[in-house]
């Protein structure tokens, strides 16, 4: 006990510096927004998009060249995340982009990349999206790319493989690509930029299949679709294209994107190009909107964000600052709260297909994406608003009520919550040959469900309410044998376990329950010698990495919050975790985090949330201070 009292000034000073740093990051309008890092396919595909749309800015291309070379590793490859293994798809796309920009295959960075690509079987070993981009520029035959025809738009909402069986991100992508694949356009590369060398390999291709395994039925279906494509007459094709086009035009976001994410946005612009609609307001808005997602880098590079996270970052920052002790009516928090109120969505989106009678009230991840609010953001924002006092208290309460009711209405039949849709659990999309990329459905997840419960707990609800009781039962069913919980949207078991234990405590579950104690033991068993916690993105594919990896500030914070919620704030493990955050804090009050701790698609796409390294340690230290001072 005496030792902890000695440490108190250190963690308190660390928390004070963290608060000051977070406040310094707030934008004048009241929100927080950190760049969202991913991998270089974003920039490589941007280069090819500019070629296809005939809108190449040479200064921008040079900045992208600098960025791509900056991100290239010593062995000549690119990875999906820092410290990750070489990734063939990413390396192929970066190579093609660099050659288009003007680099020769004989330059050393290109030679290194080429040797790796050839050693893996070349283009034929790559994913569908990579081969599709190469088909668009004439470097791969369209007939070898799995087909998604626009006639998919005719499948009714109750029919297998209709577009609403796909997750929201895949749905918009499929609709846009259906138009592109219908026309199978080719925008040839200039002769100097062509890449026949990517076929120069004696290594057999190692192509992976669909996420769920294609199976002969789905392979036969794809062959049939290609056969149909070759016919001279497609009686319903034009009507299908019009339906797909109308669907896209109806769902363009206010910022010009589609879904607030890169893939459907790029493909929608290509679709509009091949439909000769480059003067259409939707195309102009979409093209101009790309600038918001670009980031100028201090060394002269330029990167493109897969998405942007201002609402998410702001909600988390408010929660962190309130936990750290800022008053509910602090002027900076009032400004943030009022900014969040303006982001509430009051029109139906795709979610209403499954919930037509549910009134809107959710929040989206981005600045302006009204058709795709998500449960995770809504839970965090409603929870954050519940910690504030604003000048217009009636408006705050009304917003919370709408958001709360929307979340309740989005509960899936198994008791959990998905991110964007209810019961988006069909397995069929995972078997389509086209779907060899990431997740294509949006089933309930442990971490989203946990954030909902912690939100509800902040209002005083507990498991006497059936909605919460069903969610708790869902979480108990999903617990892994070792005591941990999976993290769908954060890496990985540390994220899931930290969220779930905190949630169970928030809704009044006795943390002395054996299954919760097992989770806490798992957390303590995975602490690193330096006192922190870390988990490698490889844990999604190799169980040996579960809870293991170099320590990071955000993952240490998640582990600490589990221990604090579970009644172990005064444990040696918690003390050492806090000490890690104290010792690794920068002089300016922030933290460095070289590894990604966010997840887009497990096994396929990872994210570096640049605000996580600051908001989560602040939140954890604030909770630690409260727990220690209550003893």
From Swiss-Prot:
Instruction: Identify the stretches annotated as PFTB repeats.
Output: 15-56, 61-102, 241-282, 400-441, 468-508, 516-557, 574-622
Give the membrane topology, semicolon-separated if more than one. Answer: Peripheral membrane protein
Activity's sensitivity to pH is recorded as: Optimum pH is 6.
GO CC entries? lipid droplet; plasma membrane
Q: Kindly list the places in or outside the cell where this protein is found, as annotated in its UniProt entry.
A: Cell membrane
InterPro entries in UniProt: Hopene-cyclase (IPR006400), SQ_cyclase_C (IPR032696), SQ_cyclase_N (IPR032697), Squalene_cyclase (IPR018333), Terpene_synthase_CS (IPR002365), Terpenoid_cyclase/PrenylTrfase (IPR008930)
Q: What is its EC number?
A: 5.4.99.17, 4.2.1.129
Family assignment? Belongs to the terpene cyclase/mutase family.
Function, as annotated: Catalyzes the cyclization of squalene to two pentacyclic triterpenes, hop-22(29)-ene and hopan-22-ol (diplopterol); hopene and hopanol are formed at a constant ratio of 5:1. Is a key enzyme of hopanoid biosynthesis; hopanoids are components of the bacterial cytoplasmic membranes that play a vital role in stabilizing the membranes.
Protein's UniProt name: Squalene--hopene cyclase
């Amino acid at each position: 006990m005496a030792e902890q009292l000695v440490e108190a000034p250190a963690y308190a000073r660390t928390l004070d510096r963290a608060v000051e740093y977070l406040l310094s990051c707030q934008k004048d309008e009241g929100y927080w927004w950190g760049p969202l890092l991913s991998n270089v396919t974003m920039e490589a595909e941007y280069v090819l998009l500019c070629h296809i749309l005939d809108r190449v800015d040479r200064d921008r291309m040079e900045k992208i060249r600098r960025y791509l070379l900056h991100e290239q590793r010593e062995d000549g490859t690119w990875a999906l995340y820092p410290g990750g293994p070489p990734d063939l798809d990413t390396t192929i796309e970066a190579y093609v982009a660099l050659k288009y920009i003007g680099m020769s295959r004989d330059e050393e960075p290109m030679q290194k990349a080429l040797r790796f690509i050839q050693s893996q079987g070349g283009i034929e070993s790559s994913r569908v999206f990579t081969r599709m981009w190469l088909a668009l520029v004439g470097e791969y035959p369209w007939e070898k790319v799995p087909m998604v025809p626009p006639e998919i738009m005719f499948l009714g909402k109750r029919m297998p493989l209709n577009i609403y069986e796909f997750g929201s991100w895949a749905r918009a992508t499929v609709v846009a690509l259906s138009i592109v694949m219908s026309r199978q356009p080719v925008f040839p590369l200039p002769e100097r930029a062509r890449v026949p060398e990517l076929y120069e390999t004696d290594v057999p291709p190692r192509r992976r299949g669909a996420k769920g395994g294609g199976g002969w039925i789905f392979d036969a279906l794809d062959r049939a679709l290609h056969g149909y494509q070759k016919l001279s007459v497609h009686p319903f094709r034009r009507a299908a294209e019009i339906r797909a086009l109308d669907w896209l035009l109806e769902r363009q976001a206010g910022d010009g994107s589609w879904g607030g994410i890169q893939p459907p946005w790029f493909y929608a612009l290509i679709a509009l190009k091949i439909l000769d609609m480059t003067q259409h307001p939707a195309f102009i808005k979409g093209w101009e909107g790309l600038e918001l997602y670009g980031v100028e880098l201090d060394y002269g590079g330029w990167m493109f964000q897969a998405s942007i996270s201002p609402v998410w970052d702001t909600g988390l920052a408010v929660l962190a600052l309130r936990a750290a002790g800022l008053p509910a009516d602090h002027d900076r928090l009032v400004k943030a709260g009022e900014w969040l109120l303006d982001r509430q969505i009051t029109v139906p989106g795709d979610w209403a297909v499954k919930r037509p009678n549910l009134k809107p009230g959710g929040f989206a991840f981005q600045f302006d994406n009204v058709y795709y609010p998500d449960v995770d953001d809504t839970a965090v924002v409603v929870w954050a608003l519940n910690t504030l006092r604003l000048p217009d208290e009636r408006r705050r309460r009304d917003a919370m009520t709408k958001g709360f009711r929307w979340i309740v209405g989005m509960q899936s039949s198994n008791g959990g919550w998905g991110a964007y849709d209810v019961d988006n659990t069909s397995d069929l999309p995972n078997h389509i040959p086209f779907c060899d990329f990431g997740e294509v459905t949006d089933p309930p997840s442990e971490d989203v469900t946990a954030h909902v419960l912690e939100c509800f707990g902040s209002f005083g609800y507990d498991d006497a309410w059936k909605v919460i009781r069903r969610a708790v039962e869902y979480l108990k069913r999903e617990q892994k044998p070792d005591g941990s919980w999976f993290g769908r949207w954060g890496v990985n078991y540390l994220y899931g376990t930290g969220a779930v234990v905190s949630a169970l405590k928030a809704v009044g579950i006795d943390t002395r329950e054996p299954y919760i104690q097992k989770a806490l033991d798992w957390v303590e068993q995975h602490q690193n010698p330096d006192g922190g916690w870390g988990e490698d993105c490889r844990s999604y594919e190799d169980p040996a990495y579960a809870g293991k990896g170099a320590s990071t500030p955000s993952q240490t914070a998640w582990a600490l919050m589990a221990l604090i919620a579970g009644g172990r704030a005064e444990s040696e493990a918690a003390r050492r975790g806090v000490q890690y955050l104290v010792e690794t804090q920068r002089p300016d009050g922030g933290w460095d985090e070289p590894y990604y701790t966010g997840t887009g698609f497990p096994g396929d796409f990872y994210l570096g949330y640049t605000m996580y390294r600051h908001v989560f340690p602040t939140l954890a230290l604030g909770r630690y201070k409260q727990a220690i001072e209550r003893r």
